[in-house]
A protein has these predicted regions:
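Charged, amphipathic alpha-helical linkers/stalks
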Residues: 32-76
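C-terminal recognition-helix end and immediately following basic linker
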Residues: 1-43
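Charged/polar, solvent-exposed surface patches and flexible loops
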Residues: 22, 26, 44, 48-55, ...
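Short, solvent-exposed secondary-structure capping/transition elements
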Residues: 19, 32-34, 86-90, 148
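Charge-dense, extended regions
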Residues: 147-227
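Intrinsically disordered, low-complexity regions
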Residues: 17, 43-46, 74, 78, ...
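Extended alpha-helical scaffolding regions
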Residues: 59-140
Length: 227
């Protein structure tokens, strides 16, 4: 029989019920945080980690997660995922799990950046175009202007940030004249900040290798009157 004044999480006994009520041990704290987004992210990655490395279909429980010695590291990464809002989250999770990089080092900008650059090169042109247009529309709604004027009117610091975040794909940026015209307005520093994300030499070869996709971008831009 469990004593009524014993913490069900850590087993500690208290002489007064009120003391038990305000008591917060690490196991209880983890239980109370269960519905926090960053904890849910960490739990999801924890489950996927064991699916990949143990080749099992048996899903890890939240109780197993709270008792794991790696709980804090997974939660830290879950918080980092909230911060960066990664492109294709499930692919990103698999990328870091299979990267052979230590768990404690997963929440690193350079690791995500490498993933993002690879993903921008590999994703279908339709997905890249859809995301870029959605980004332009968000900007247009904020500014109360036409989204097709993005490349002409957006302030360059914002454009730099959205290129670095992968929100504006090289498919669109380098695939239409308006995007290239905006790049010509960048300072040397801004060009340097975006260089590794857009890699003009790579994308020039990409357009030659996939002429139908390049034409699709150009025709979409023309139809939308992106200028």
């Amino acid at each position: 029989m469990v004593d009524l004044n014993t913490c069900t999480y850590c087993g500690k006994f208290f002489t007064r019920e009120r003391t038990l009520q305000v008591h917060v041990c690490e196991p209880k704290r983890r239980h109370l945080q269960r519905n926090e987004k960053f904890v849910q992210n960490g739990f999801m990655v924890f489950q996927r980690f064991y699916e990949i490395h143990q080749h099992t279909t048996k899903t890890k429980t939240y109780n197993e997660f709270t008792k794991s010695q790696y709980y804090n590291a997974f939660v830290k990464f879950g918080r980092y995922m909230m911060y960066i809002n990664p492109l294709y989250p499930e692919k990103y999770i698999d990328y870091v799990i299979l990267s052979k990089i230590k768990l404690d080092h997963w929440a690193r900008d350079d690791l995500y950046e490498a993933y993002l650059i690879d993903t921008l090169k590999a994703e279908p042109v339709e997905a890249a175009l859809q995301r870029s247009i959605a980004t332009m529309m968000d900007w247009a709604q904020e500014q109360n202007v036409q989204w097709s004027d993005y490349f002409r009117l957006v302030n360059t610091p914002r454009a730099v940030q959205e290129i670095q975040q992968g929100k504006i794909s090289p498919w669109v940026l380098l695939g239409c004249s308006a995007g290239k015209k905006m790049l010509n307005s960048f300072t040397d520093e801004q060009l340097q900040m975006t260089q590794r994300f857009i890699n003009p030499e790579y994308w020039s070869n990409k357009f030659k290798s996939y002429p139908a996709d390049h034409l699709f971008v150009q025709e979409t831009a023309k139809e939308a009157r992106i200028e």
